[in-house]
């Protein structure tokens, strides 16, 4: 399968933003990984860990292992870091979302980038979401199924592309802003163009 020959328009949108980025973006996964589930399965090892950074807080946590399943304490540590910081509220984050983040981080590591995912936003209460500029009223942030992330030294286009082809939900690319939105749910992608001032 040609790396740019995706049947879904959502993938074409992200890849179209990058041109020659396509080959580099798919480096680190095998040619046999043709479907999003295949790609994610290939990237998720017997030990699923996340390296996260949010402000002054840093966390490296192994939330799942093949022989032990989910590690409750490490999972709760991740949920704490992804809390609504304005409301100081913690919420159980979606396991599938953590797997997508782990897949992206593993993929980056296989291409020589060993950097934490910088968290810009995780869980949001409805009140915080209402105060967040441009947030959808039914945002997946309010149900623990979305994060906004960036990685030092990685373009947002590349990061969005990686999250998109893992196929677990939505990916939002915001040109001119410093993060990529990743969520679990319906597969879709959007590029939010900066609004012109009148």
Please place each PLM-identified region on the residue numbering.
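Structured segments of extracytoplasmic/periplasmic soluble domains
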Residues: 100-111, 126, 152, 162-169
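Charged, often glycine-rich, active-site loop that binds/positions anionic groups
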Residues: 127-140
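Catalytic cores and adjacent binding grooves of peptidoglycan-active enzymes
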Residues: 17, 42, 48-51, 137-198
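Active-site acidic/histidine clusters and adjacent loop/turn architecture
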Residues: 66-118
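C-terminal segment of N-terminal export signals and the immediately downstream linker at the start
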Residues: 25-60
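Surface-exposed patches in mature extracellular/periplasmic domains of secreted proteins
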Residues: 111-122, 170-174
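N-terminal secretory signal peptides and thylakoid transit peptides that target proteins
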Residues: 1-24
């Amino acid at each position: 399968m040609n790396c740019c020959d995706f049947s879904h328009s959502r993938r074409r949108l992200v890849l179209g933003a990058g041109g020659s980025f396509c080959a580099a973006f798919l480096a680190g996964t095998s040619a046999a990984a043709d479907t999003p589930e295949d790609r994610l399965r290939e990237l998720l090892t017997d030990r699923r860990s996340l390296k996260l950074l949010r402000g002054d807080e840093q966390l490296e946590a192994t939330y799942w292992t093949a022989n032990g399943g989910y590690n409750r304490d490490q999972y709760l540590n991740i949920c704490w870091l992804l809390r609504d910081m304005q409301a100081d509220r913690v919420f159980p984050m979606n396991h599938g979302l953590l797997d997508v983040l782990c897949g992206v981080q593993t993929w980056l590591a296989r291409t020589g980038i060993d950097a934490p995912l910088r968290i810009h936003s995780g869980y949001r209460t409805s009140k915080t979401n209402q105060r967040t500029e441009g947030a959808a009223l039914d945002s997946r942030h309010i149900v623990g199924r979305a994060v906004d992330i960036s990685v030092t030294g990685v373009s947002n286009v590349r990061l969005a592309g990686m999250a998109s082809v893992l196929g677990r939900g939505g990916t939002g690319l915001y040109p001119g802003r410093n993060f990529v939105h990743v969520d679990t749910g319906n597969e879709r992608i959007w590029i939010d163009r900066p609004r012109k001032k009148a």
